Amino acid sequence: MDENKQKALAAALGQIEKQFGKGSIMRLGDNRAMDVETISTGSLSLDIALGAGGLPMGRIVEIFGPESSGKTTLTLELIAAAQREGKTCAFIDAEHALDPVYAKKLGVNIDELLVSQPDTGEQALEICDALARSGAVDVIVVDSVAALTPKAEIEGEMGDSHMGLQARMLSQAMRKLTGNLKQSNCMCIFINQIRMKIGVMFGNPETTTGGNALKFYASVRLDIRRTGAIKEGEEVVGNETRIKVVKNKIAAPFKEANTQIMYGQGFNREGELIDLGVKHKMVEKSGAWYSYNGDKIGQGKANACKYLKENPEIAKTLDKKLREMLLNPENMQLIAETSSAADDVEFGAVPEEF
């Protein structure tokens, strides 16, 4: 670029920054925050599938799936992880179904959690926008999009037609929210439900509620499904769960995480550590015995999980080593080359009898 153009560009940039504030325009390479800040989801295998170690701050995230698949559990696990880092979280409970006892069991500090149970969809989204603009809230969860009922529909008669009303309301909210969330570095998670499209002969008949705007504005979309039951004798104690990253703007999409959600406990973190540790040769398995750093930690997976639960420092060290290995781009190619030779281990394998 010649000298005159450089001067003109510098003057234009200076004028823009003077009018709209510092940071309103910059060269892409000058942005110090190119590495997106993330918060752990509470599941190691999901953090790895996301490719960045968690869900991104300052972005919109959509989590959808069938009923009782673990959508709210996933968000409560993330809130607990965020609170442990000293972050402020809010839960907009449009379904009026948040269970504080269950939230507390998952590690959520309910005394510090901000909760709103709005009357209308517009009120819920206005509260969400106000919290984002405040700059004091780090994580907002909206449960759920399907329950964001427009005021006109609530005040109208049963059977009245309100074509596209909710979709228009959400589309306007997305336009307002996106910039505010980015400026305040606040993550907004929308939980969504699944509906069936009528008359679809070929392809997937499933769709999510609230129109298409949320699909476009979301940086990450997670599809969570229950794939089986975990039994202790005859009693069902948890669910096998598969989480697919169907959209990802911060890393490669379409990866899957298989995990377990135990009733009243949340993610089976110790089970994930054992499975990933064995897969990547950090935990040795000889017959039914599991060993870590040469020391036997249990006979059978259930006992190995129990050992890690009783020794949180060892579990924390193993978690840190696995994250450093699996989230380091330099190691990803090596892992991809050796994974075909290694024995595949299902993250969500059914644990042996407790």
Curated annotation (Swiss-Prot):
Alphabetical list of SUPFAM superfamilies matching this protein: P-loop containing nucleoside triphosphate hydrolases, RecA protein, C-terminal domain
GO process terms (BP): DNA recombination; DNA repair; SOS response
GO MF, any single term: ATP binding
Keyword presence, Magnesium: no
Keywords: ATP-binding, Cytoplasm, DNA damage, DNA recombination, DNA repair, DNA-binding, Nucleotide-binding, SOS response
GO cellular component entries: cytoplasm
Keyword DNA-binding: yes
Signal peptide as annotated in the record: none
Source organism, top-level taxon: Bacteria
Primary residence: cytoplasm
InterPro entries to which the protein is assigned, alphabetical: AAA+_ATPase, DNA_recomb/repair_RecA, DNA_recomb/repair_RecA_CS, P-loop_NTPase, RecA-like_C, RecA-like_N, RecA_ATP-bd, RecA_C_sf
Subcellular location: Cytoplasm
Binding residues for ATP: 65-72
Family indicated by similarity: Belongs to the RecA family.
Stated role: Can catalyze the hydrolysis of ATP in the presence of single-stranded DNA, the ATP-dependent uptake of single-stranded DNA by duplex DNA, and the ATP-dependent hybridization of homologous single-stranded DNAs. It interacts with LexA causing its activation and leading to its autocatalytic cleavage.
Entries under HAMAP family matching the protein: RecA
Protein name as it appears in the record: Protein RecA
